[in-house]
Amino acid sequence: MSTTIDTIYDDFAFLDDWEERYRYIIDLGNGLEPYPEAARDEAHRVRGCVSQVWLHTERGDGDDPVLTFRGDSDAHIVRGLVAIMMLLFSGRRASEILAIDAENVMRKLGLDEHLTPQRANGLRSMVQRIRNEATEVAPAAG
């Protein structure tokens, strides 16, 4: 069974404390697909993150293309947060990505209260980068 955001909600509810949840987040990061070494460059780096974070986007065809994201970080917990963002956004159409309320997901997981301000800002930077990628290719509203 593949992990979904609903699975993460359920698993977080089951785990007793934040030490266990952080271990779970690290495990999610360890499950990321290997990130291409050639994409560990300035063009793919997410600015606004204290840790090194890289994000690579593949765009499908059409008016509302599917965007596939791959990401990585040099920090264990941040790599886990990258994994959560990949589960939330990757493999969706641009218009679907723009409709996702990532802040609400973070609140439901309790991350808004348990991340350092630096990690929370980095997470927002990653979400903004993903949203910017989707905005570039999403069909115009109207």
Annotate each PLM feature:
Residues G91-M106:
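Glycine-rich phosphate/pyrophosphate-binding loops
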Residues D74, I84-L87, L109, N121:
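Feature captures hydrophobic
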Residues E58-I77, M86-S90:
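Conserved interaction-surface patches within small, structured recognition/assembly domains
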